[in-house]
Swiss-Prot record:
Pfam families: ILV_EDD_C, ILVD_EDD_N. It comes from Burkholderia mallei (strain ATCC 23344). The active site is at residue 473. This is Dihydroxy-acid dehydratase. Pathway: Amino-acid biosynthesis; L-isoleucine biosynthesis; L-isoleucine from 2-oxobutanoate: step 3/4; Amino-acid biosynthesis; L-valine biosynthesis; L-valine from pyruvate: step 3/4. The gene is ilvD.
Length: 557
């Protein structure tokens, strides 16, 4: 039986003789035209450690596709480094790159009539970009995560990239020596691989195991390890079998499997960015999913993993403790996962987890039993109020001060806010407002890791609030609220905040409130004028023109 269901459109028949001529130039033989064409979307790049170790994974996938009797077709996907662009204008391209990656994969797979695709990625937006593409085109596909970085070490302390961001605030506050500052800087990132805590890259890749679109254990492997290469090869073999079975992403990505993915995100203390990305993935798969669904799952799924940024451990520790399968087995036994969801292997999630122990190992402290959860409810909460009528997102677990009411310190760009923090112009009790940074206004919802880390480094993490219509890095923690919708650029209430206004952030009531009377707000609204777009040409201008609100995933189509 032939499995080239799609590629036959470009290789078969008399009229396709010129097409075959070009394939012959690539080394194809006549018998190859009856084999399926498998794309390898290779995100390898030397601009970031997150992607610098992907080539050997892609090479392993190519070899495995050949061994499985199919034709590998390699094409590239772009990336930017969130960590390197953080705190600069370059960060505005981060979320935009999610859309660009999705469009690149769609363009190559559809334009070349590929029968399946192995997506290999590393940095934060590689994962949602790839999964959006797979859900959109609905061609058999699998996601191969590049793997996590190993933790750095300095004077007996484990380090991640967030350690370096927080060191900026500590150093400028006089709380860290020059030696330690440089020691953290030089040792925070010791290997290739994505940032090591349960930040955005590890959050999304972990959730893909639960979604059913990545192999078990693959998300917590370290990039430098041989098992990561072996997993990439096995993923490619599984994908070829999925092509033979005609098992497509939308057979796997369902509302129930997204619930599984989000449940794992809650259980592991994952990134706020997951809210934005799963809204986008669901949209691509044409699944009814809203921010209210996150709140529904938060209320029933506890946090059972002690992982950075708010906890102690990193992804390699989680891997040693049993990985995401161990987390999923605990959730499944507690009735918190849909075990009948299909996975890319052709087996159900429950079948995949059959041999995983029901009790986590006693010699580890990363994964807690359900009855010993760190928090009884999930950490990613949807806040609403007159400052966020369409919702905002916050991490609410572990806060020493879950309610803050304080004067607004208003900034219309990130750099001004960061300067104020580093210059000690932000005081305990203040609520920093960073606005005109939403999908349209930023554009691109840049992440605010630099200012939030500076606040923590200054020792103000428990006493200063920060709200924004932009985003936060997965490495952010503290009294911070992002994804405020409607955003300032379209006239959301956040645009009407004035310096010194009283603002309340209440994690108990899930409230984000500007304490100004309605008459005054109406007066301000009547006087407000939309600012001119920051960009009028190029990809940022295109994104700003097309982007939907944050509560709809900030998608472009």
């Amino acid at each position: 039986m032939s499995y080239n269901r799609r590629s036959k459109n470009i290789t078969q028949g008399v009229a396709r003789s010129p097409n075959r001529s070009m394939y012959y130039a690539l080394g194809y033989q006549k018998e190859d035209f009856d084999k399926p064409m498998i794309g390898i979307a290779n995100g390898h790049s030397t601009i970031t450690p997150c992607n610098a170790g992907l080539q050997r994974l892609s090479d392993a996938a190519v070899a495995a596709v050949k061994d499985a009797g199919a034709n590998p077709q390699i094409f590239g996907t772009p990336t930017i480094s969130d960590g390197m662009s953080m705190g600069t204008e370059g960060m505005k391209y981060s979320l935009v790159s999610r859309e660009v990656i999705a469009d690149c994969i769609e363009t190559c797979v559809q334009g070349q009539w590929m029968d399946g695709v192995v997506v290999v990625g590393g940095c934060d937006k590689n994962m949602p970009g790839g999964m959006i593409a797979l859900a959109r085109i609905n061609v058999p596909g699998i996601y191969v995560y590049g793997g996590t970085i190993r933790p750095g070490h300095w004077k007996g302390h484990d380090l991640t990239i967030v350690s370096s961001f927080e060191a900026v605030g500590e150093f400028t506050a006089g709380r860290m020596s020059q030696e330690d500052f440089e020691g953290v800087e030089k040792n925070a990132c010791p290997t290739t691989g994505s940032c090591g805590g349960m930040y955005t890259a590890n959050t999304m890749s972990s959730s893909f195991e639960a979604l059913g679109m990545s192999l078990l254990y693959s998300s917590t492997m370290a990039n430098p390890d041989q098992e990561k290469v072996d997993s990439a090869a096995e993923s490619a073999r599984v994908l070829v079998e999925a092509v033979k079975k005609d098992l497509k992403p939308r057979d796997i990505i369902t509302k129930q499997s997204i619930e599984n993915a989000v449940s794992v995100i809650m259980a592991t203390g994952g990134s706020t960015n997951a809210v934005l990305h799963y809204l986008a993935i669901a949209h691509a798969a044409e699944i009814d999913w809203s921010i209210e669904d996150f709140e529904r799952i938060r209320k029933r799924v506890p946090v059972i993993c002690d992982l950075k940024p708010s906890g102690q451990y990193v992804a390699t520790d989680l891997h040693a403790a049993g990985g995401i399968p161990q987390v999923m087995k605990l959730l499944l036994d507690a009735g918190l996962l849909h075990g009948d969801c299909m996975t890319i292997t052709g087996r159900t999630l429950a079948e995949e987890l059959k041999d995983v122990p029901s009790v986590p190992r006693a010699d580890q402290k990363v994964i807690h039993p359900i009855d010993q959860a760190l928090y009884k409810e999930g950490h990613l909460a949807i806040l609403k109020g007159n400052l966020a009528e369409d919702g905002a997102v916050a991490k609410i677990t572990g806060l020493k001060n879950p309610v803050i009411t304080g004067p607004a310190r208003v900034f219309d760009d990130e750099q001004s806010a960061l300067a104020a923090i580093l210059d000690d112009r932000i005081r305990a009790g203040d609520v920093v407002v960073l606005r005109y940074l939403g999908p349209q206004g930023g554009p691109g919802m840049p992440e605010m890791l630099a200012p939030t880390s500076a606040i923590i480094g200054k020792g103000l993490g428990e006493s200063v609030g920060l709200i924004t219509d932009g985003r936060f890095s997965g490495g952010t923690w503290g009294m911070v609220v992002g994804h405020v919708a409607p955003e300032a650029f379209v006239g959301g209430t956040i645009a009407l905040v004035q310096e010194g206004d009283s603002i309340t952030i209440d994690a108990h009531k899930l409230l984000l409130q500007l304490n100004v009377d309605d008459a005054e707000l109406a007066r301000r609204r009547a006087a407000w004028k939309q600012p001119a777009p920051r960009y009028t040409r190029g990809v940022l201008a295109k994104y700003a023109a097309l982007a939907r609100p944050a509560n709809q995933g900030a998608v472009t189509g």
